[in-house]
Amino acid sequence: MPLRGSSARRRGWAAFATAGFVAAGLLAGPAASARPAPDPSLTTMSIKSPPGGANVRVLIFYGSAASGDESPVVNAGIAAIERIGLSGPAKERFTVEATDNANVFTNEKRLGRFNAVVFLTGGGDVLTPAQEAGLEAYMEASGGFVGVHDAARAEPYSDWFTGLVGARPAASSPTKVQRATVEVGDRRHPATKDLPMEWKRPDAWLNWQKNPSGEVHTVARVRESTYAPGASANGADHPVSWCRDYDGGRSFYTGMGGTVSSYDETDFRAHLRGALLWTTRLAQADCKATITGNYKAERLTKPNQPGQNDQIGEPHGLVTAPDGRVFYIGRGGADSSRPVITDWNNPDVGKGKGEVHVWDPKTEEVTLAGELTVFGNKGGGDELTKVEEGLLGIELDPRFTENGWVYLHYTPHSGINRETRMAERRVSRFTLDRATNKLDLGSEKVLLKWPVQIHSCCHAGGGMAWDSKGNLYIATGDNNSSGFSDGYSGNNPEPNYKGVSFADARRTAGNTNNLNGKILRIHPEPDGTYTLPEGNLFTGKETAEGGGKTRGEIYVMGVRNPARISVDKQTDTLYAGWVGPDAGAPSPTWGPAKYDTFAVITKASNRGWPYCMGNKQPYRDRNLPDPSKPLGWYDCDAPKNESPNNDGLVNLPPVTGNNIWYSPQGGGPDFPRDENGVPSYKQEEGTYKLPWLKGGGQAAMNGPVYRYDADSTSGTKWPAYWDGKWFVGDFYDADQPRNAVLMDPRTQGDGGLPVHSESLKKIVPVGNDGIKNLMGWKFGPDGALYVLDYGRGFFTSDSKSALWRVTYEGGGPTPAAGQLARGTE
């Protein structure tokens, strides 16, 4: 049967389908379990590379193994692609021909005229072995392929065709047309770059026998929580459109397009048009960015020598220099073979070494740049024994290349008072001898200092980050015990040591006059002092409630233990994550379970702790004389600090909802609320807004926002696909997150949920021999990701404590610039 041109119409494909399959012997008897191998004499086609002439042509193949009338969906698809070919700039237009005659795949001259082939087929065997061999030869010659919806059911016994389409539908996929939300995660591919981030549309959604994620590059996923996916559901990661470079050519598949109405949609036609631009060689695209085999994770540091921390201390943060060196710190825990001193009568109680190591990419060697004597080495044990103080954070001056200034956030051992069990926390500036990679400890300039209690562990925070204006952000923990509140709000005012509460975070995180439980923002000056930038939460000069009850350094209040923060210097947006309390389940009496939290912070704000968590879910108040008795629920819109340990304002700023929160039960837990806005906190009534993550043991570990540098010549930089995506992780590596998420700029500052998330666990590998215990991650100037693995112990370093690097090795976009088609003029 001859090919038809773009304006022709013919009916009755059933005659060809029946004849073709009888000729192939495929209608006689039951289906074979495997396809016969093609006759070698039928696989010697020679198709010019790349196929297609000066003017771009697209072949639509709509053959089907089923008998009957021509499908209206196929007709709609053909008409839509014809329309697409006539649209857009002249240089992006193309000619369309359609056929149901599979003999075109054995005609090398005719097949070689087409830049891309579109399969609008139904299921079943639609090609003979020789015809499939012709299609394979076409792809090997750098041809393009687009499969639409039921094309994934074609050639069911061919492993090669399975690879071409990427996945096979599950037999029990729902057949009903349902409206669902598609998460459009690739904002650069021509098939998706102009689509809504959250694309709501009806279709017949397919489930997959095997999830193709990691083997293909997924450009869009369907959100299963928005429709009924049935028993064969794929879960939170449900790819619906993807692409990859395959067998010498380019393959794009979409599971959408299963309805006639799909082809009437402007956005769906734009989706197909972008797929065709890439497969016809009219545009380049990166279809390698999320294929896990394109990444390499390598350990950069060796295990320490016995009894030494020559390679790494107890990992607690890292930063990269413009020349590629990686500076990373050890908090203060010693090698496990060394004794620790926990007796407060001993002047050396808790004494440890906060180490700064430097890994040099030129030599691939490690230098111990310096050691600070810190309070931070008491080993493990209960909360009145262990300690999380020490060397907590590191940053390099924005002009580090010229001045060699290094900023350290730490607790000096010289500043402890064993009698009162108080200590001094400080942020200091040191100068590095750049020739020797050694810190000049005598160069210290103390910028900022404040008191912390050290009678009880925990929650020191520690991360620091710069914005583009030279403002330094400093994350501090609530300096509070995890106990005495049954794992709910840390608001028990009773426990204290010599008058200082250590179980009431209203003294710290909820206190407008205390620097603990905050993210501070200051502007360091060259003389070692600092000024306060405009736009902090307070000026420090407020006269409310008598005055003298605020600190101007506070940018964010109400955070519990923000170990890691980052700032996207392109937007100066702050990203933070903090660890939550310990309650394993929600309580209708006391409030939410432990929520670990991530937030996009676009302005000074109160993030809630210890009054509210998540999306403004309140805790129950408690107070003297009997903190075991619940009082009223906190008002997240107008919180009050009525703790006897508060020396700040009573009336606090309203709480801003957070973007990501998770508990042992799941991600984004929420509950029905009563007329006062109080959730029921009944576990059986919980719903989960973020099904892609879950807690258990959990410790949020905020990461960077990746920014692609097109001018960089680095061969290891991550692709542009990741540009603008925010990396969120957890110390633990089971159900806990290790994901890249896409936020909507319109809603992210007000607690908007991520619109898209994808797992990084096969790229930043989990497991005992991988990066099991994530302790920090940042991109370097080379575009590679540098990661700290804490190791397998606690309060010490061990053989698994290490610095890692994750690089991209997949190559650039395809097709090569020299293979781009000219297009119709």
What are these regions (language model features)?
Residues 320-323, 396-402, 466-469, 568-571, ...:
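Residue-level detector of Asp-centered blade-edge/turn motifs that repeat once per structural unit
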Residues 286-292, 334-354, 380-384, 389-391, ...:
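Beta-propeller domain segments
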Residues 57-154:
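Helical hinge/lid and interdomain linker segments adjacent to catalytic or ligand-binding clefts
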